[in-house]
From Swiss-Prot:
This protein is similar to the oxygenase domain of eukaryotic nitric oxide synthases but lacks the reductase domain which, in eukaryotes, is responsible for transfer of electrons to the ferric heme during nitric oxide synthesis. Affinity for substrate L-arginine is increased by TrpRS II. Its EC number is 1.14.14.47. This is Nitric oxide synthase oxygenase. Its cofactor is heme; (6S)-5,6,7,8-tetrahydrofolate. Pfam families: NO_synthase. Catalyzes the production of nitric oxide. The complex between TrpRS II and nitric oxide synthase oxygenase catalyzes the regioselective nitration of tryptophan at the 4-position. It is an enzyme of class 1 (oxidoreductase). It comes from the Bacteria.
Amino acid sequence: MSCPAAAVLTPDMRAFLRRFHEEMGEPGLPARLRAVEEAGLWWPTSAELTWGAKVAWRNSTRCVGRLYWEALSVRDLRELNTAQAVYEALLQHLDDAFCGGHIRPVISVFGPGVRLHNPQLIRYADDPINADFVDKLRRFGWQPRGERFEVLPLLIEVNGRAELFSLPPQAVQEVAITHPVCLGIGELGLRWHALPVISDMHLDIGGLHLPCAFSGWYVQTEIAARDLADVGRYDQLPAVARALGLDTSRERTLWRDRALVELNVAVLHSFDAAGVKLADHHTVTAHHVRFEEREARAGREVRGKWSWLVPPLSPATTPLWSRRYRAREESPRFVRARCPFHTPTVHASTGHAPTG
């Protein structure tokens, strides 16, 4: 994988290297800057990449789970130069991150010639939020079977050549949603995948953008209050309310609110029963307060986007409700992948080709 050359060090590169050496207590900053200038290019070392990825998580204004930023496992995969190799690395990412249900935070960083077209590694074809991406996959020759919760294939591009790959069943860990009391909720046939892996972001370190796949673990509200509940998603609150026997004839019965709480109860119960790590919104917001306290002791300001940090369920009961943050994100950071100005050549995978 070729590395991008720069005639001189940019201010962003200088700032990144300066912060890296300061925070890590690494000597030799003048020598490092001089070596980069003499070479005429900057290609981060593995140590610089690892620090940059961890700090990008620390700086993420949309993430409420930043307390564990130092525990991020960073996989330096910049040398991979085929779609097949990237695909195999992503399968390993899923296995490493799931860790038998003891989910751990992992990031896989690729070279600049790689593009992961999927917004997340695991998404469903019948989820309305994925409608545009499903249309894109259709143009590349994939045909959905029309099943509920059908896992989408991966579209991986390397140096302008795109290939489709199916995720084998053993790579996709899912949890069936049941309720500890209401059997009717379990009869709805709901389920969700255990591992959220964001794959449409780039890691911005010193102005260098590298594609990556980043995963932590779910907060139950992400699944129960958004994915399964939003009207523009799976819109399951009416079905949950019927399973609970609630009066849905008028809004003043608060049937939506009651169904929403019980769906959250069901998701928490189901992940616990399956032995899969899942945060709850009260604990994770308390952890964010601890994160803020640690950062204050280190002399660093915590920035955040309030609407992302405050949960969609009972937000006023959490400690973040009354807090305010500056929203502008600092580098290192995660940024949305830029859309390419070319149409990749599409090839059928010779490995796990998607089924239709």
